[in-house]
């Protein structure tokens, strides 16, 4: 998301692994191309990325994608109870403040333990805080920034195109195709329609600066 509230593709890299070194290299490449003012990074529970964020963007906040968080909890829940647990988890993120969400999370943890779902309770207890970072931002942005759904259209498009081709002679040819599709999607409504009103964020940041 750029400063004007439009979605923007910052870059793509070939053969990147999920370790810290790869993420640090990618982030530093983006910085070298002029990236600055990063306020929030949203992602799944990738330790390599988390460690890299702390090193390259020490002042940037991290939001764990709530959808990935739910899936992680569901992995230790019987299929027969997934629907009810899903409602419980969504109730946490339906609260109107971080304090209320924390209190709701405590209640959910207690309820999960009462349901004999100790592993699920532990996952919620241990991981809920990093899913609540979005509460530090303007309320109207919450549904936009608590998941990484913003890139799902890109991922679907990339998978669709690469499956058609099947195999590539080398990594560079694959990267060229991916970048071509990213440029195409960026030129559609995905990138041309305003996604967020950034004036609220600017005002909130000004208030914080003034208070400091």
Where do the protein language model's features map onto the residues?
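Residue-level signal for pocket-adjacent positions within structured domains
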Residues: 8, 60, 68-72, 140, ...
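Hydrophobic/aromatic-lined pockets within catalytic cores
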Residues: 31, 35, 54-58, 74, ...
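Conserved beta-strand -> loop -> alpha-helix junction used to position metal-binding or nucleic-acid-contacting
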Residues: 40-47, 52-88
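Acidic/histidine-rich catalytic cores and adjacent linkers
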Residues: 91-212
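Short acidic, glycine/Ser/Thr-rich loop/turn "cap" segments at secondary-structure junctions
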Residues: 8-12, 35-37, 70, 88-93, ...
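A generic short alpha-helical patch detector that favors 3-5-residue windows
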Residues: 15-19, 41, 62-65, 77-81, ...
